């Protein structure tokens, strides 16, 4: 990357510059014009700054507290009319009603309990007989299913053994009859080379020009 877009520093231009530019580089400017005091050591300036900040925060809090949320108008409900009857009469009426209800509730459960017990006994007897019959049927069905599963497993095992025997026999016959040919025999270049080799024995063809038949004939005819 090039840095031609950046202004050149004075250290590269030299000490004496005849034409001064208005451009000032950030590195040439003063970096810090004010003194920074340590905050962990208490000085007059740091204490005054802290007090000012604390006062400012307190003023904000008080201003926020002074602002009250908008109040809703409450509707005043009309007062109910006060009854003139004394409280003692009402209490007596309630106690009498409760006693009557208790007496009726004690009589009715006793009659119901006897009838419920008889009905429950009859229902239990019927349910027990039905459960026994259903259990017998379930056991018979389970035994049948178990027998069917066993038969299926035996068939699968016999089929697998037969298949393995047949496969082994077929492999033996294939090995004895024919052997696998290599992939090289099916290639075109291999077949061509064999054909050419048989022809070369008869023609004595060579790529060497000195040992070729044509060259030897030429030499014997015109030179020797």
Curated annotation (Swiss-Prot):
GO terms for cellular component: catalytic step 2 spliceosome; nucleus. GO terms for biological process: mRNA cis splicing, via spliceosome; mRNA splicing, via spliceosome. Residues 114-139 have a biased composition (Acidic residues). InterPro entries: Cwf_Cwc_15. It holds the Pfam family Cwf_Cwc_15. Residues 214-224 have a biased composition (Basic residues). Residues 7-24, 74-83, 90-113, 144-157 have a biased composition (Basic and acidic residues). Keywords: mRNA processing, mRNA splicing, Nucleus, Spliceosome. Residues 158-168, 200-211 have a biased composition (Low complexity). GO terms for molecular function: RNA binding. The keyword Nucleus applies. Residues 1-37, 52-224 are annotated as: Disordered. The keyword Nucleus applies. Residues 60-69 have a biased composition (Polar residues). It comes from the Eukaryota. It is found in: Nucleus. Belongs to the CWC15 family. Associated with the spliceosome. Involved in pre-mRNA splicing. This is Pre-mRNA-splicing factor CWC15. It comes from Candida albicans (strain SC5314 / ATCC MYA-2876) (Yeast).
């Amino acid at each position: 990357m090039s840095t031609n877009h950046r202004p050149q520093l004075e250290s590269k231009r030299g000490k004496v510059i005849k034409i001064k530019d208005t451009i000032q580089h950030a590195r040439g400017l003063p970096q810090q014009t004010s003194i920074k005091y340590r905050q962990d050591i208490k000085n007059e300036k740091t204490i005054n700054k802290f007090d000012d900040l604390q006062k400012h925060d307190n003023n904000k809090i008080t201003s926020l507290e002074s602002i009250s949320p908008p109040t809703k108008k409450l509707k005043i409900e009309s007062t109910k009319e006060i009854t003139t009857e004394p409280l003692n009469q009402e209490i007596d009426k309630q106690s009498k009603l409760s006693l009557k209800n208790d007496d009726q509730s004690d009589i009715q459960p006793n009659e119901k309990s006897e009838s419920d017990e008889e009905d429950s006994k009859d229902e239990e007897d019927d349910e027990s007989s039905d459960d026994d019959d259903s259990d017998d049927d379930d056991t018979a069905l389970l035994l049948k299913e178990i027998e069917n599963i066993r038969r299926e497993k035996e068939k699968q095992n016999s089929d697998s053994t037969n298949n393995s025997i047949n496969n082994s026999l077929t492999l033996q016959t294939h090995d004895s009859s024919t052997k696998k040919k290599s992939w090289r025999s099916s290639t075109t270049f291999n077949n061509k080379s064999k054909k050419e080799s048989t022809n070369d024995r008869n023609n004595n063809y060579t790529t060497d020009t000195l040992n070729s038949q044509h060259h030897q004939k030429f030499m014997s005819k015109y030179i020797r």
